[in-house]
């Protein structure tokens, strides 16, 4: 086993994206302290669970700090050296970064400057991109995602990735790339170049592996912004949206929602239908849904037809099988989903 890098890290992370990165740090640096925001309440009466990063810290016997009332309960240790953030969601104050000998680095799941902001993975899927990626950069003391790029790796997409799968692959690739950054001491100011371009370039495999490549073969990207996602982004309009748009929404959120009989209805795992003749659905209007041969629940889009595979949920009820629901709703005669 290779000796650990003599580095004391404050790791700031929250969700599943941060887990492979934290595990990599545990294996390759001298000491890790974990800082996270609180988890999200799963129900109105339920307790707030620990976020994934906190549970991983506990499982490995690491010191864990849950931020409360801003940063008031966070205290530096004299031997803290470097902050590393991954899907943390908060700005690290200058007074903290300024006390660390090596400042901080951030791991962002996009090919910066493309998709600066809060929702890069969602934007990648919603826009139907064919490339995703990860950037490791220094932390800027004034703005998100504006530091100096240290390393970048891209991933070729097949157009079927879900948010969960894409996040997992990118986080595994990011973990591998972070190890190269630390081994080459790129967190040290005197090891950073004055150029904008990253010093490490890579390609992420579809299993999350990392292959280093030359900068000459690395694509370039225009600056853009990834907005913060809201529930409205999963609101589907079958009358104005084409099949690909809706499929991208389903891949991003695992569901879309619309209105049926003046109530919200959630449709899970919605896919384009490829295996039947157009005669089976050509008569349908956008938004109309019907059973096909009693084993598929179809819904018509602006340009084609889709099948609801994962289930249907009405308001606060449980998810039910789409075919069984289709057999009972309106006596099996179908209906029409509305936007409003």
Curated annotation (Swiss-Prot):
Keywords assigned: Cytoplasm, Mitochondrion, Protein biosynthesis, Transferase
Cell location: Mitochondrion; Mitochondrion matrix; Cytoplasm
InterPro entries (UniProt xref): Formyl_trans_C, Formyl_transf_N, Formyl_transf_N_sf, Formyl_transferase-like_C_sf, Met-tRNA-FMT_N
Chief subcellular location: mitochondrion
Assigned EC number: 2.1.2.9
Matches recorded under Pfam families: Formyl_trans_C (PF02911), Formyl_trans_N (PF00551)
The keyword Protein biosynthesis appears for this protein: yes
Domain of life per record: Eukaryota
CDD domains named in the record: FMT_core_Met-tRNA-FMT_N
Ribonucleoprotein among keywords: no
Reaction catalyzed: L-methionyl-tRNA(fMet) + (6R)-10-formyltetrahydrofolate = N-formyl-L-methionyl-tRNA(fMet) + (6S)-5,6,7,8-tetrahydrofolate + H(+)
Gene Ontology biological process terms, A to Z: conversion of methionyl-tRNA to N-formyl-methionyl-tRNA; mitochondrial translational initiation
Record field: transmembrane: none
MF terms (GO), sorted A to Z: methionyl-tRNA formyltransferase activity
GO cellular component: cytoplasm; mitochondrial matrix; mitochondrion
Top-level EC class as recorded in UniProt: transferase
Main function: Formylates methionyl-tRNA in mitochondria and the cytoplasm. Responsible for the formylation of the N-terminally formylated (Nt-formylated) mitochondrial matrix proteins that are encoded by mitochondrial DNA. Nt-formylated proteins in the cytoplasm are strongly up-regulated in stationary phase or upon starvation for specific amino acids and are targeted for degradation by an E3 ubiquitin ligase-mediated fMet/N-end rule pathway. Increased Nt-formylation of cytosolic proteins appears to be important for adaptation to these stresses.
Family of the protein in this entry: Belongs to the Fmt family.
Protein name (record): Putative methionyl-tRNA formyltransferase
Lineage: Eukaryota, Fungi, Dikarya, Ascomycota, Taphrinomycotina
Gene field: fmt1
